[in-house]
Amino acid sequence: MQIVIIKEFSNIPLLDHFSESKEICLVAHPDFAAQYGLRYYLKVRQKLQQKLPCHHIDLGIACDDLPGFALEVIAAKVDRLYFLKTSPYWTQIESLCQQEGILIFNQQELSCLL
């Protein structure tokens, strides 16, 4: 799976860049995810899926240590959630993700998000 960190739609590389991988995970950068809002990134995924119909596109949102935003992301049922495992909220957020079938990752493992 090819992981692409995005800030805004114009930040996504050229479409021919994706031809090598049929699975793409767009990850909204934490500095921009809360600012632009979840709907923005859902639209980005939708637009990219329309342009690349033969690809499977997951959406991941990086939330830093913002439990309120993480709850919004979980409610929207995105594919992946990136959260700081050092957060005191990790256990609760992880449990909710498991209940909803959302993959949760330690945000610190993606150095490009730090």
Protein language model annotation of sequence segments:
Residues 2-6, 22-28, 57-63, 80-83, ...:
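Hydrophobic faces of well-ordered beta-strands that scaffold small-molecule active sites
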Residues 8-10, 66:
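Helix N-cap/beta->alpha junction signal
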Residues 10-13, 33-46, 85-99:
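Active-site-adjacent beta->alpha loops and helix N-cap segments on the catalytic face
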Residues 14-15, 73:
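Conserved, mostly hydrophobic/aromatic
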Residues 15-21:
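Glycine-rich phosphate/diphosphate-binding loops that line cofactor/substrate pockets in enzymes
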Residues 27-76:
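N-terminal active-site wall of soluble small-molecule enzyme domains
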